[in-house]
């Protein structure tokens, strides 16, 4: 700790740590869940200040991976906050340090190959269909953009089009010159700079555009310099990220406290619970942070993790590149494959990962233990390996071999170890980052294993706008034996809620906010009217809820998903929709113009709603399709119910 404090002071970063500590302190005081991730997890100072939540000594993390006294660059701590309260943190930062001393960071969008063709074609007044034909011939591969010159070399049809007419040749030649040119300005999703004097004294500023220009954004300025230039100037930068997982966990823990009386937070959710690892080993990971994908689920079922270290390793390995080592890791873990080391001195470093190099920190420890590197030099080595700089690699190869020889390690073995590192460069992953995310993965699994109703309710509420995820998580609820009830005008809130049965067989009730085309305004109007008690019938609903505020479209969608089934059949309610909205509007207009009696009651006769005589069974399949369309799944029934007995006899 004394060593770290000395380095931080020598490098002039005391203020940086205190500002980040202040942000975390405020978040704790206001109940805003946060998590600091990345290489900062290697700092004991950050851990003791409650900036990071992972013990660096327990997990073998290295301070110099985060802050190297020989590499003068600004520290970088990424702060994840629950995404629904991230704006509160930005507001506090602007208020505490001054509106004129904080700014977000600009980004520049450049013109891609297709966009260049389309923009140039528009200026040249070439027919849109022709321009579109040219643009679509350039392959659009996510993560592997192809430039116009590459397309001319590799795509025969594009080359043929280029040679076909003079105007296509001019279009493509001009677009080639425009490709890569800055097209628009945006705002970095997370980066915020904080200065001691007005920001304008350090860096030119810009008015934000897009979502960053919204009135509710507490930070009103953006730098004119992008991230790399901000770093080069040495300005203090903090990344404010929003993480929905923290929102889910916080909401679930609030429900647990409300229903069970237990108070959980990130500091006391266990990571050593056997039932949690059993859940992970069964692959029941829908809604569990970082591990819910089908590939990850398959490997977890093979692994049967027993400890947090197992999960941390899987988080690091489950990426393109290292994924090829997962089968070997699992076999070694279960004793089905021999654990081997290039040299016996590697065992203390690689034992936790069964002889396989998984983390960047393992390269650093190996260089320190086998070749006498200092932690700072080991960090330079790690960086050189990661960036594949030939001159740096050659220099370090010679240095490593020389140091290894002094420890009686043969040159050929030292060369083999270094060769392994060069291959490792394809997938090296910082253990600090994997540990942060591994802890959250295990903690979310714990909440799901022990408090499934509360956890799934929070999960569904956060993802209620994503019908695909809602369908997935509702199916998982049903697998766990948790009943998910349809939206109901008298029982649902905006979010999903928990309903306890007579014997505490808790169920989850769909939130009205999960219904498509039903926004906050309509739901607020309904909930405000319902504050005096449930609606007794359709007349009571129309005369207590101002359906002008609800809106005809939202009301129609609520009827279609069955939220008003207590008041009549869906077809009948839909036919009476105009009558329903008209009577409600007349009633509330009368209230507004003061047609009230002396004692505050409406004068005259309350107009009754007459529902048409229609069988409730009419259009059953169509009603289920409405549910599928508006909330993403069948909730009141299933189209296969009539043939379920037959299916049970014939399908296994």
Regions found by a protein language model. Give the residues of each.
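Noncatalytic, beta-rich nucleic-acid-contacting surfaces in large DNA/RNA-processing enzymes
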Residues: 1-652
């Amino acid at each position: 700790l004394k060593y770290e404090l000395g380095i931080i002071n020598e490098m002039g970063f005391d203020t940086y740590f205190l500002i980040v500590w202040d942000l975390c302190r405020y978040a704790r005081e206001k109940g805003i869940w946060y998590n600091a991730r990345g290489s900062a997890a290697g700092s004991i100072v950050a851990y003791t200040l409650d900036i990071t939540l992972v013990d660096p000594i327990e997990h073998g993390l290295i301070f110099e991976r985060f802050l190297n006294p020989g590499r003068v660059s600004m520290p970088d701590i990424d702060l994840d906050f629950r995404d629904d309260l991230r704006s509160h943190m930005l507001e506090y930062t602007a208020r505490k340090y001054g509106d004129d001393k904080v700014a977000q960071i600009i980004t520049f969008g450049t013109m891609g190959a297709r966009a260049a063709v389309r923009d140039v074609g528009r200026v040249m007044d070439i027919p849109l269909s022709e321009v579109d034909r040219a643009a679509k011939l350039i392959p659009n591969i996510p993560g592997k953009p192809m430039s116009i010159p590459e397309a001319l070399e590799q795509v025969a049809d594009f080359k043929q089009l280029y040679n076909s007419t003079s105007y296509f040749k001019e279009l493509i030649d001009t677009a080639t010159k425009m490709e890569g040119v800055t097209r628009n300005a945006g705002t970095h999703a997370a980066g915020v700079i904080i200065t001691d004097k007005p920001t304008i004294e350090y860096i030119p500023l810009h008015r934000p555009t897009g979502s960053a220009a919204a009135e509710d954004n507490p930070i009103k300025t953006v730098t004119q310099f992008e991230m790399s230039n901000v770093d080069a100037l040495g300005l203090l930068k903090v990344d404010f990220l929003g993480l929905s997982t923290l929102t889910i966990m916080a909401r679930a823990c609030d429900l647990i406290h409300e229903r069970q009386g237990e108070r959980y937070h990130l500091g006391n959710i266990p990571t050593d619970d056997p039932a949690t690892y059993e859940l992970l080993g069964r692959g029941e990971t829908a809604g569990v942070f970082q591990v819910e994908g089908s590939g990850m689920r398959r490997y977890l079922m093979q692994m049967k993790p027993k400890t947090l270290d197992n999960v941390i390793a899987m988080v690091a390995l489950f990426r393109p590149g290292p994924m090829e080592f997962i089968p070997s890791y699992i076999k070694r873990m279960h004793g089905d494959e021999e654990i081997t080391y290039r040299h016996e001195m590697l065992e203390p470093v690689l034992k936790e990962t069964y002889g396989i190099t998984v983390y960047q920190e393992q390269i650093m420890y190996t260089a320190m233990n086998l070749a006498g590197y200092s932690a700072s030099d080991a960090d330079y080595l790690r960086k050189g390996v990661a960036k594949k700089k030939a001159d740096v690699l050659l220099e370090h190869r010679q240095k490593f071999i020389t140091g290894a020889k002094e420890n009686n390690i043969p040159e050929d073995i030292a060369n083999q170890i270094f060769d392994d590192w060069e291959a490792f460069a394809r997938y090296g992953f910082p253990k600090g980052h994997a540990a942060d995310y591994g802890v959250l993965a295990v903690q979310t699994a714990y909440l799901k294993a022990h408090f499934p109703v509360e956890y799934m309710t929070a999960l569904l509420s956060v993802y209620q706008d994503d019908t695909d995820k809602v369908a997935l998580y509702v199916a998982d609820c049903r697998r766990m034996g948790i009943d998910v009830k349809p939206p109901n005008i008298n029982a649902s809130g905006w979010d999903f809620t928990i309903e306890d049965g007579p014997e505490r067989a808790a169920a989850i009730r769909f939130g009205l906010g999960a219904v498509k085309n039903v926004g906050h305004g309509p739901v607020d109007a309904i909930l405000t009217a319902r504050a005096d008690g449930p609606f007794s019938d359709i007349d009571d609903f129309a005369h207590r809820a101002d359906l002008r505020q609800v809106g005809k479209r939202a009301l129609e969608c609520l009827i279609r998903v069955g939220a008003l089934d207590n008041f009549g059949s869906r077809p009948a309610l839909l036919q009476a929709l105009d009558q329903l909205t008209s009577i409600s509007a007349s009633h509330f207009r009368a209230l507004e113009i003061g047609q009230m009696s002396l004692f505050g009651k409406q004068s005259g006769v309350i107009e009754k709603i007459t529902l048409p005589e229609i069988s409730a069974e009419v259009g059953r399949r169509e009603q289920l399709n409405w549910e599928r369309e508006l909330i993403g799944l069948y909730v009141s029934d299933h189209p296969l119910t009539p043939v379920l007995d037959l299916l049970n006899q014939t399908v296994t």
